[in-house]
Amino acid sequence: MLVLKVLGMIWWLLVIPFGIGLLVAALTKKFRKNQEFQELPSMGAMLLGGYILMFALLELVGIPVMLFSVYHGFSNLYKIYAPLLILLAIAGIGLSVHWQIFQDIMAAQRFKYKESPFDRWEGWFFLFVFLLLVGVQLYMAFTRASFDGDDAYYGVQSLMAQQTDTLYRINPNNGRSTPLDARHALALFPIWEAFVGTMCGVHATIMAHSVVPLVLIPLSYLIYAEIAKIVFADRKALRPLFLVFMALWQMFGNVSIYTTETFFLTRTWQGKSFAGNFVLPAVLWLFLCLFYQEKKEKPLVLWLLLGALNLAAGASSSLAVLLSCMLTVGVGFLFMWKERRVQNLLLAGGSCVLGGLYVLLYLAL
């Protein structure tokens, strides 16, 4: 039974998002005929893209279900959401095989490995130090539990979705039925934890406290690894050192209960942590991908992914949508100034459309 649960977690937390990321890579390769195999995204970037689209789809499916389903909202959600995720992942894997994208991906990985910073012992040493630091963080996150009052709300909402088959229709403080909690209802991150737990046969609280940190902590570092590839493109030996610095920064950033570093390691399962440690760094990562594109015409898929990210931010927190859209427009203005192209600002604004609709719905509720 335990083996089946672990396999279920691997399926829903690794295979499905990676398959969705493959779909993005396959479509990009198909519609950019002159794309070289070296330009294909890395496997880590595809996994990140899959998670972005997975949370964006959660909002697209979950918000209407939540608004119109007073009873059986949770079961209605996973009956729609789960098949869509599986179809997208199968489509990504199938198209990659049909269009022979896998061969290009493996060729790109071999090419990038030859250009990696690990041709010297210093690179391997700092990589070992980084993995050791992350291992300590994962061990502490799995074996220790920090007290946090927000569990009385967010953790309970996740558990009530499993046990009562409703979405934000019960007050977690007294257990009574209540009108839709408009303040928190659009942020479906606790519901996602309940969804994955239900699909794997795991209690929502165990999923939130023991499993989610093992996924989101490495996922956040994966963003920094992708950022390092861009920022230190010509100084590859500094990439592992940058990751060591980020790991130490997270470990010693607990100067108050409000820092993103504190949320990152002690409240990983909460949407606010996901907003500060995944969504906002991912916005910067996507803009760095756009900034460092040598071709004048930027890949449209990056702008579409940015739009999906601004919607996915709503899964973590209603405020996160506003912050990510503000960051998108602000960096988009700098992007326009750098390249002297108004189109960049217009595309940045266009990527905020779904996020803007989210904010309008929040205000209407």
Question: Where are the regions a protein language model picked out?
Answer:
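Membrane-embedded, hydrophobic transmembrane alpha-helices
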Residues: M1-S116, G355-L365
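Membrane-interface alpha helices of multi-pass inner-membrane proteins
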Residues: V301-S318
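Membrane-interface transmembrane helices that cradle and orient dolichyl/undecaprenyl
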Residues: L280-V301
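Transmembrane signal-anchor helices characteristic of membrane glycosylation enzymes that use polyprenol
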Residues: E122-G149, L248-F252, S351-L363
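Perimembrane helix-loop-helix junctions
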Residues: S324-G349
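Membrane-interfacial loop-to-transmembrane alpha-helix junctions, especially the N-terminal start
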Residues: K33-M54, E122-G123, A237-L243, K298-W303, ...
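Membrane-embedded alpha-helical segments of multi-pass membrane proteins
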Residues: V15-G19, A82-L87, V215, L219, ...
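Active-site lumenal/periplasmic loops and adjacent helix-entry segments of GT-C-fold
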Residues: L133-Q250, T259-W269, F274, F278
